[in-house]
Amino acid sequence: MAKQPKRMQKWTGDVAATHALDEAVKLVKANANAKFDETVEIAVNLGVDPRHADQQVRGVVALPSGTGRDVRVAVIAKDAKAEEAKAAGAEVVGAEDLVERIQGGFMDFDRVIATPDMMALVGRLGKVLGPRGLMPNPRVGTVTPNVGQAVKDAKGGSIEFRVEKAGIVHAGIGKASFTEEQLTANVKAMVDALNKAKPSGAKGTYVKKVSLSSTMGPGFKIDVASLGV
């Protein structure tokens, strides 16, 4: 028999089975056996073709239980808005100087927020931030005059999501140390946000498959009906 990968050795059940949401959460927690606090990840297969402009799915969701991770925020702003960002807890704040640092390879942040007046500057960073999914965008609230609130949202559990080429959305929605109730609430919030972001061009079944896993654990398929969608 072929040797199972390490992340599958603990689970001997039927990998093709589907589970109600609460049962899937229990299984993910029970199989998160690494020596670190594993991230719990959701994968949602959507009935969209991202190659078409009218089938793009992108947005932001405030997870009610937070993410369990320390989010480092960079803000591109100046004067009073720069001070507002610092007061809200942004780790890195700057204008032309910060743009030049990022162009030079500085990437010690998880989220980039910018004020609208800085977008001409930020445009220089498209090739650097775009492929990493970090480019500020007004559609997800990372281009805004309200930088203080945006920083607080990012640090308080607000995450961005975007459909990938295969029509799948991946996101970290908590830690294995979270309670079952916390993880369940975050999953429901994520699926609700995806439903609200349903594009006009989506036809047929929108939420097709949902699975939940931890960083080193197996994936468990969730019965979509148990999500109320």
Curated annotation (Swiss-Prot):
<dbReference type="InterPro" id="IPR016095">
    <property type="entry name" value="Ribosomal_uL1_3-a/b-sand"/>
</dbReference>
<keyword id="KW-0694">RNA-binding</keyword>
<keyword id="KW-0820">tRNA-binding</keyword>
<dbReference type="Pfam" id="PF00687">
    <property type="entry name" value="Ribosomal_L1"/>
</dbReference>
<protein>
    <recommendedName>
        <fullName>Large ribosomal subunit protein uL1</fullName>
    </recommendedName>
</protein>
<dbReference type="InterPro" id="IPR028364">
    <property type="entry name" value="Ribosomal_uL1/biogenesis"/>
</dbReference>
<dbReference type="GO" id="GO:0019843">
    <property type="term" value="F:rRNA binding"/>
</dbReference>
<dbReference type="GO" id="GO:0022625">
    <property type="term" value="C:cytosolic large ribosomal subunit"/>
</dbReference>
<dbReference type="InterPro" id="IPR002143">
    <property type="entry name" value="Ribosomal_uL1"/>
</dbReference>
<comment type="similarity">
    <text>Belongs to the universal ribosomal protein uL1 family.</text>
</comment>
<comment type="function">
    <text>Binds directly to 23S rRNA. The L1 stalk is quite mobile in the ribosome, and is involved in E site tRNA release.</text>
</comment>
<dbReference type="GO" id="GO:0006412">
    <property type="term" value="P:translation"/>
</dbReference>
<dbReference type="InterPro" id="IPR023674">
    <property type="entry name" value="Ribosomal_uL1-like"/>
</dbReference>
<dbReference type="GO" id="GO:0003735">
    <property type="term" value="F:structural constituent of ribosome"/>
</dbReference>
<keyword id="KW-0689">Ribosomal protein</keyword>
<dbReference type="InterPro" id="IPR005878">
    <property type="entry name" value="Ribosom_uL1_bac-type"/>
</dbReference>
<comment type="subunit">
    <text>Part of the 50S ribosomal subunit.</text>
</comment>
<keyword id="KW-0687">Ribonucleoprotein</keyword>
<dbReference type="GO" id="GO:0000049">
    <property type="term" value="F:tRNA binding"/>
</dbReference>
<keyword id="KW-0699">rRNA-binding</keyword>
<comment type="function">
    <text>Protein L1 is also a translational repressor protein, it controls the translation of the L11 operon by binding to its mRNA.</text>
</comment>
<dbReference type="InterPro" id="IPR023673">
    <property type="entry name" value="Ribosomal_uL1_CS"/>
</dbReference>
<keyword id="KW-0810">Translation regulation</keyword>
<dbReference type="GO" id="GO:0006417">
    <property type="term" value="P:regulation of translation"/>
</dbReference>
<keyword id="KW-0678">Repressor</keyword>
